[in-house]
């Protein structure tokens, strides 16, 4: 357990030596963000954030706004949930991390799919994909939020990039906000052993 100040100090030395350009953190909590930032300004924080997982809004995003730190949400498509490609009968292979995540166990997945139905209403009205709605919603939150959706297929990359052209109006954003808040996410983010490694 190395104090975060020591980590930040080492990164500061690397930046001053020209070996590193910026200091980023991942899955850090508010206390560690503040402590690290006091030693070496943090450029960006990476953590999960999407219509499916809005926990960073409670404490993380206000601190990032206060300190001028960018936010890089991973899993902005809710690990595939927000693409509309999953069903209650979806089975995940042994190499798929979702096979280990409580949110994607059969009962939890069935309950969590209620959010997809609500997002689909906006997608159909706008003539775009569910994934584009989810990414456009993130892009509309703050100019310093830059999601990093992952894909292995060119057509999905092109679809994801298309989200930058989507304009969600105030009514769309309010509808998505209400939809997201109306569905209580079932299942923990990670199994207990993995969850303990996260700084919050």
Per-region residue spans from a language model:
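Conserved PLP cofactor-binding pocket of PLP-dependent enzymes
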Residues: 187-192
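Beta/alpha (TIM)-barrel catalytic core signal, keyed to glycine-rich beta->alpha loops juxtaposed to Asp/Glu
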Residues: 1-178, 193-200
């Amino acid at each position: 357990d190395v104090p975060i100040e020591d980590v930040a100090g080492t990164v500061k030395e690397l930046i001053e030596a020209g070996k590193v350009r910026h200091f980023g953190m991942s899955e850090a909590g508010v206390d560690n963000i503040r402590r690290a930032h006091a030693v070496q300004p943090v450029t960006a924080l990476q953590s999960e954030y999407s219509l499916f997982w809005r926990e960073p809004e409670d404490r993380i995003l206000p601190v990032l706004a206060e300190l001028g730190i960018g936010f890089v949400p991973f899993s902005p498509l809710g690990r595939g949930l927000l693409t509309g490609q999953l069903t209650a009968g979806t089975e995940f292979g042994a190499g798929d991390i979702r096979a280990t995540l409580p949110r994607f166990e059969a009962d939890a997945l069935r309950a969590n799919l209620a959010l997809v139905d609500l997002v689909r209403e906006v997608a159909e009205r706008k003539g775009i994909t569910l994934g584009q709605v989810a990414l456009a919603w993130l892009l509309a939150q703050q100019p310093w939020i830059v999601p990093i959706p992952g894909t292995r297929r060119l057509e999905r990359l092109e679809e994801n990039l298309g989200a930058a052209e989507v304009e969600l109006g105030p009514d769309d954003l309010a509808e998505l906000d209400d939809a997201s808040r109306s569905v209580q996410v079932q299942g923990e983010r990670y199994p207990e052993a993995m969850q303990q490694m996260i700084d919050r």
